[in-house]
Amino acid sequence: MPENPSPLPAARSKRPLVIGAAAAVALIGLAGFFGLARLKRPAGDAACTAAVEVAKKIAPLAHGEVAAVTMASAPLRLPDLAFEDGDGKPRKLSDWRGKTVLLNLWATWCVPCRKEMPALDELQGKLGGKDFEVVAVNIDTRDPDKPKNFLKEARLNRLAYFTDQKAKSFQDLKNVGRALGMPTSVLLDAQGCELGTIAGPAEWASEDAIKLIKAAMKPATAGF
């Protein structure tokens, strides 16, 4: 008698049916998955159309030290991220409406983040004011004093301290495809619309970055 007998004819005939049924279920599952993925894509915001035009105009300035910035190609208003200031008071991203904003998410466990912070601090010192703000949100989920101590020891005193100990800001940006790694920075116009995004560090105090941000601060109708 053979060691591995062939399946009985009836069983053999059922195997393709089982495989076919499994394949059908898999295809249905994939269709559902991709359907959900499409639903999760940001629908866009018609009010942010002007920001896309600005992004197109200033795109040639995204070179050199800021070459990794991806300029906006579709209208997107960022979620109204919620976090706290250094005194524990609740803040929202919309608090800065009326200003051009460089939103930055950072953490002390992120080496590129720590290296980038001095440049962000310098940028705030150079351009920060009534028309522009660096909003750097720390997303450490443990030891709330650690990021404060880091800023103090590094003598970075021009950046205001903001924290999101649940790291929900990162998840909210991830949900709209704008948080792929750390650090993450998003350049926003005065209406909270995306102008450009970068996953990774940049020399934000460089001449290249200053020129890009100054151009972003101009009205949408201005020439560049």
Residue ranges, per PLM feature:
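Thiol/disulfide oxidoreductase modules built on the thioredoxin-like
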Residues: 153-158, 164-215
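N-terminal targeting signals for export/organelle localization
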Residues: 1-77, 222-224
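Conserved redox-active cysteine motifs that mediate thiol-disulfide chemistry
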Residues: 97, 105-122
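Alpha/beta-hydrolase fold active-site loops
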Residues: 100-101, 132, 183
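Short, low-complexity, Pro/Ser/Thr/Gly-rich segments in the mature regions of secreted, periplasmic
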Residues: 214-223
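A short beta-strand-turn-helix
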Residues: 70-75, 80-101
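Extracytoplasmic
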Residues: 76-78, 96-98, 129, 156, ...
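Structural microenvironment flanking redox-active thiols in thiol-disulfide oxidoreductases
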Residues: 114-155, 165-173, 211, 224
